[in-house]
Design a protein with these regions (language model features):
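Short, structured segments at the rim of ligand-binding sites
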Residues: 1-370
């Protein structure tokens, strides 16, 4: 354990959005011609490396130099695909319905923690379409039609279907059988497909129409990541001021909501010129619905520790099925530091303003907790 002293303040540049990068890389692999993806980190994190390795295994050619990735779309269709997703849920869930449309049989290699996460909504759906679908393998093509699926387990299921259905020769409909959570990630997938010539549209509240479009090469730039920035913004609300540069004020990333959450809590928030600055104010506890922004829960918890009164984080039941049970992990580790926090099935309540102390904490093999 490393102990730091002092009050966090200053300026930091947002890292590139991994959510956008995953989608751009897959779209480029599925597109005709050579695409260019700019603004990536000079050293790819493990989950983006997993996606890069997998699209190469699918038959795409890729060259990475500095912060730019050049991808030439898939032009070979191997009989057997072996896709090592490591611990990347995005890689696995986005590529799972795509893979059988590329090759004869796809075999997935997953980390133990990723293997334990649910995939039944997708495997059962594909089985109903005549595909031999198991958690670690999938084979058999499928055609256009209606694809009913739950919207409250993982938005990545819907994003994977959007990518796959764009490859088919007829129109398809994704019909949500339960309310959609984390809608912004689905919108990010739709926007990524649109950048490569794909087309989809909402038909009411529960159906997405996906039109057949041959994806074309594109030149795109990955924007800054609001999810990663949320921790620095929370630090600014407590200690600050902290400025995060490289953020698009018009971004469709759902986790941009961290700015409005901190504003509601009483922090001073300024956005302009591609940067966000958060300064301390008199923080107060609030209720936060994280059904569309579950990845903000750790950062909200940090700000809540310094707020007067109770902060209630709710509608985040899916947090229990991430890389770890994040609700339990947040509660357990903050209690080690002296926090007054109670778990709920779908969130937690923090009574802030108490005195904290140092402690040895565990990361639970989860980068959001670390």
């Amino acid at each position: 354990m490393t102990r730091f002293s002092g009050r966090p303040h200053g300026s930091v540049t947002a890292i590139p959005s991994k959510s956008a990068a995953h989608r751009y890389m897959i779209c480029a692999a599925l597109a005709q011609g050579r695409s260019v993806i700019r603004g990536l980190p000079e050293e790819l994190p493990d989950d983006l490396t997993a996606t890069l390795d997998c699209i190469r295994a699918l038959g795409a050619a890729a060259v990475f130099r500095d912060d730019t990735l050049e991808i030439t779309g898939i032009n070979a269709k191997p009989d057997v695909l072996r896709l090592d997703c490591r611990d990347s849920g995005a890689t696995y869930r986005l590529l799972y319905p795509v893979a059988p449309l590329i090759g004869g049989r796809a075999e997935f290699m997953l980390s133990p923690s990723l293997s334990a996460r649910p995939m039944e909504p997708v495997t059962e759906l594909l089985k109903s379409k005549g595909v031999a679908a198991e958690k670690l393998s999938v084979s058999g093509s499928f055609g256009p039609g209606e694809f009913p699926i739950r919207g409250d387990v993982s938005s990545q299921y819907i994003s994977g279907l959007l990518l796959a259905l764009s490859l088919l020769e007829g129109e398809s409909r994704i019909r949500l059988t339960t309310p959609l959570q984390s809608k912004s990630y689905v919108e990010l997938t739709r926007a990524s497909l649109s950048a490569f010539g794909g087309e989809s549209q909402w038909m009411g509240q529960d159906t997405i129409l996906v039109k057949p479009r041959r994806l074309k090469a594109a030149d795109v730039t990955v924007e800054g990541d609001y999810t990663h920035a949320s921790l620095f913004l929370a630090a600014g609300a407590v200690y600050g001021p902290v400025t995060v540069t490289g953020l698009d004020p018009g971004s469709i990333q759902g986790d941009r909501a961290m700015l409005s959450i901190l504003d509601r809590m009483g922090a001073r928030v300024d956005m302009g010129g591609g940067s966000a600055t958060v300064s301390p104010g008199r923080l107060r506890g609030i209720d936060v619905d994280v059904s569309d922004t579950p990845d903000l829960a750790p950062a909200i918890a940090l700000a809540a520790l310094a707020a007067e009164g109770s902060t209630v984080v709710k509608n985040g039941g899916r947090l229990r099925f991430k890389e770890c049970d994040r609700i339990s992990a947040i509660a357990t580790e903050l209690k080690r530091l002296g926090a007054d926090i109670d778990e709920a099935p779908d969130g937690f309540t923090i009574r802030g303003g108490g005195k904290l102390h140092g402690a040895a904490c565990l990361c639970h093999n989860d980068h959001r907790i670390a």
